[in-house]
Amino acid sequence: MSKVYDWFEERLEIQAIADDITSKYVPPHVNIFYCLGGITLTCFLVQVATGFAMTFYYRPTVTEAFSSVQYIMTEANFGWLIRSVHRWSASMMVLMMILHVFRVYLTGGFKKPRELTWVTGVVLAVLTASFGVTGYSLPWDQIGYWAVKIVTGVPEAIPVIGSPLVELLRGSASVGQSTLTRFYSLHTFVLPLLTAVFMLMHFPMIRKQGISGPL
C-alpha cells in the first residue's frame, strides 16, 4: 500500500496539498457563526444526493407528477425518508444561507478586498431561493400549482416586456406541462450547474483572501 502512495506522492505531491489544506491559519476571533457557510454547503450536498435518488422515481408530467411523489412516499424503499430529508435540508439550506449573509454583512466581510466574494455569495443566495421556488412546484399538487401560477404571473406588471416574460417562464400563455418541464429542468440541471460554477469561484477566493478580521 505504501508503494502505491509513494507512486502518487512522487507525481502529485499529495502531502504538500494536504498540508496546505490542513495548515491554513484560522483567526482567533472565529466562532460558530463562521461555520454557517459550511453548513449551507453541507445542506446543498445532501440536496444533490437525495434529489438524484428521487429522479429515479419522479415523473415530470402534469398527469403523473403527484402520483409519482405519492409512490416515493408510500411504495419506494426508504422513499419517505429520502424525500423528507430533501425537504428538511432544503429548509435548513435557506435558513443557513440567510444567516450566513447576515453574518458576513454584520461583520463587514463584504468590504475591500472581498467585494467579489460578496458578489458571488449574493448570486448563490439568489440561486438558493430559486431552488425553493422551482422545487416547490414539482409535486404538482394544489399548493405547487398555484404557487407557480402566482410566481410566474408577477412579471406581468412590468411594462412592455411583462407578458412576453410570463410566457417565457410558463412556456405558454397558461400554466401547464411546459411550465412543469421548465421548472424541472431548472431545478435538476440549470440551477445545480450554476451553483457549482459560482461555488468554484466563491471558495477559492475565500481560500486566497482568508477570513475577514473582527469589526
From Swiss-Prot:
Binding site for heme b 1: 100, 202
One Pfam family of this chain: Cytochrome_B
Binding sites annotated in the UniProt record for heme b 2: 86, 187
Keywords tagged on the record: Chloroplast, Electron transport, Heme, Iron, Membrane, Metal-binding, Photosynthesis, Plastid, Thylakoid, Transmembrane, Transmembrane helix, Transport
GO BP term (any one): photosynthesis
Annotated residues for binding of heme c: 35
Domain of life of the organism encoding this protein: Eukaryota
One GO location term (cellular component): membrane
GO function term, MF aspect, one: electron transporter, transferring electrons within cytochrome b6/f complex of photosystem II activity
Transmembrane segments: 32-52, 90-110, 116-136, 186-206
Keyword Chaperone on entry: no
The record's free-text note on cofactor binding: Binds 2 heme b groups non-covalently with two histidine residues as axial ligands.
Cofactor(s), by name: heme b; heme c
Main localization, broad class: plastid
Cell location: Plastid, Chloroplast thylakoid membrane
InterPro entries, alphabetized: Cyt_b/b6_N, Cyt_B6_PetB, Cytb/b6-like_sf, Cytochrome_b_N_euk/bac, Di-haem_cyt_TM
UniProt membrane topology term: Multi-pass membrane protein
Complexes and interactors: The 4 large subunits of the cytochrome b6-f complex are cytochrome b6, subunit IV (17 kDa polypeptide, PetD), cytochrome f and the Rieske protein, while the 4 small subunits are PetG, PetL, PetM and PetN. The complex functions as a dimer.
Entries under HAMAP family matching the protein: Cytb6_f_cytb6 (MF_00633)
PANTHER family: CYTOCHROME B
More details: Heme 1 (or BH or b566) is high-potential and absorbs at about 566 nm, and heme 2 (or BL or b562) is low-potential and absorbs at about 562 nm.
The protein's role, per its UniProt record: Component of the cytochrome b6-f complex, which mediates electron transfer between photosystem II (PSII) and photosystem I (PSI), cyclic electron flow around PSI, and state transitions.
Family: Belongs to the cytochrome b family. PetB subfamily.
Identification of the protein by name: Cytochrome b6
Gene designation: petB
